[in-house]
Design a protein with these regions (language model features):
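Sec-dependent signal peptide recognition
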Residues: 2-7
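C-terminal motif of bacterial Sec signal peptides marking the signal peptidase cleavage site
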Residues: 15-16
Length: 134
């Protein structure tokens, strides 16, 4: 399961190539910071076509010292959430629901896969997502 998860994660990294850089100010990122009370985890969201079963998009919710969403090459935005190069900050449960609702429709399903990880692993994945850039 871990190999499959990390293989999918590697696909996310590669799919971000070519996006335009976005860099929210430090104050906006600090203000939006959200720490989820649940266990440290990483959740892969895969958007699948209901017609063919093929993958159309993927995003990674990282719940570590804070909760962020890595959404490479995505079009999802929220005016109250700052973004830095495909990393969205301030991901509350309501924003997770909004993200899923944005992608799910009659022609697309959203599949969620979560694994619990140590705080160190969650923060390492988060640091790599933040460092990756658009």
């Amino acid at each position: 399961m871990k190999r499959l998860f990390f293989a999918l994660f590697a696909t996310l990294w590669l799919s971000a190539c070519g996006a335009e850089p976005i860099w929210a100010p430090d104050e906006a990122v600090a203000k939006a910071r959200y720490e989820h009370v649940g266990p440290t985890s990483v959740t892969l969201y895969t958007v699948l076509s209901t017609r063919s079963g093929t993958g159309a998009h993927a995003g990674l919710l990282i719940n570590g010292s804070e909760r962020v969403l890595f959404d490479p090459a995505g079009t999802w935005r929220h005016p109250k959430l700052p973004e830095r190069n495909d990393v969205h900050f301030g991901i509350t449960p309501k924003m997770v629901d909004f993200y899923i609702d944005y992608h799910a429709r009659e022609t697309y399903d959203v599949v969620e896969q979560t694994i619990m990880v140590s705080p160190e692993v969650a923060d390492l994945i988060m640091a790599r997502a933040k460092a990756y850039g658009a």
